């Protein structure tokens, strides 16, 4: 398959080199989930990992935020190695997945405050930062509402607030709109746009083409654990002579 030239990026915020992850199957055989993927993400860029279910997107992101340890290869986030400096990586990353838990008995404010304390943010810094977060995400009136009483959309906003409370330069979102209705999806995407305007580096996984078109500066398309191609949407359209994004997606992953 044709590929775009891999131009080096100076001082990338995220650099992934031949990153692999394998597991042991029920019979002891090695099952490869991610196979020697390579890509870089520029500071302030919105970068999409695009691919069908089972392509290796979630596993890749979980290695970048140190939830999983790579089987081979290297990756750095904000110049910190995900294997040898996991604590520093976690301090520089906010992670959000579709399954991020919300505690039913804690209020929205208490949950975000708890994560702030876990990150050892001084109380004099934490409160004004939380005030700003709740205002930005339009959550101020829900600060004293318990998690079990929040709507699905508010729970997702709460998860974003928790990911942002330590003001990380890098945000990793794994399928952030999965399972949400159209209105909530739009609200989440609007919030991602606001974060982009604040200079955050964002990498997120999706298989929804409209999310890619609205948000991404560049994408890496994954299939069967490998990166098939990486570039801007315009570059991919030109390379594969296909303007329709849905058709382009099917051509790349089939």
Regions found by a protein language model. Give the residues of each.
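A short, flexible loop at the N-terminus of ABC-type nucleotide-binding domains that lies
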Residues: 9-16, 21-36, 43, 86
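Conserved ABC ATPase "signature" region
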Residues: 113, 117, 124-142, 190
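Conserved ABC ATPase signature
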Residues: 146-150
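Conserved catalytic motifs of ABC-family nucleotide-binding domains
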Residues: 167
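Catalytic Walker B motif of ABC-type/P-loop ATPase nucleotide-binding domains
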Residues: 171-174
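ABC ATPase "signature
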Residues: 230-231
């Amino acid at each position: 398959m044709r590929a775009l030239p891999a131009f080096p990026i100076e001082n990338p915020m995220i650099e992934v080199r031949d990153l692999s992850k394998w597991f042991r199957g029920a019979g002891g055989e090695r099952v490869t989930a991610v196979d020697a993927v390579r890509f870089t993400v520029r500071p302030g860029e919105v970068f999409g990992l695009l691919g069908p279910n089972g392509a290796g997107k979630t596993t890749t992101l979980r290695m970048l935020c140190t939830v999983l340890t790579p089987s081979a290869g290297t990756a750095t986030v904000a110049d910190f190695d995900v294997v040898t400096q996991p604590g520093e990586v976690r301090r520089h990353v906010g992670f959000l997945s579709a399954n991020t838990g919300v505690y039913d008995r804690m209020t929205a404010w208490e949950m975000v405050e708890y994560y702030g304390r876990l990150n050892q943010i001084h109380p004099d810094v934490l409160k004004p930062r939380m005030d700003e977060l709740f205002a930005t995400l339009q959550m101020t009136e829900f600060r004293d509402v318990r998690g079990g009483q929040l709507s699905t959309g508010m729970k997702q906003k709460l998860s974003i607030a928790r990911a942002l409370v330590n003001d990380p330069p890098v945000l990793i979102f794994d399928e952030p709109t999965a399972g949400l209705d159209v209105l909530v999806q739009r609200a989440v995407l609007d919030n991602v746009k606001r974060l982009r305007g604040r200079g955050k580096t964002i990498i997120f996984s999706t298989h929804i083409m409209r999310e890619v078109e609205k948000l991404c500066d560049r994408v890496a398309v994954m299939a069967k654990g490998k990166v098939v191609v990486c570039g801007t949407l315009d570059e991919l359209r030109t390379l594969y002579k296909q303007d329709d994004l849905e058709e382009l997606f099917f051509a790349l992953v089939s």
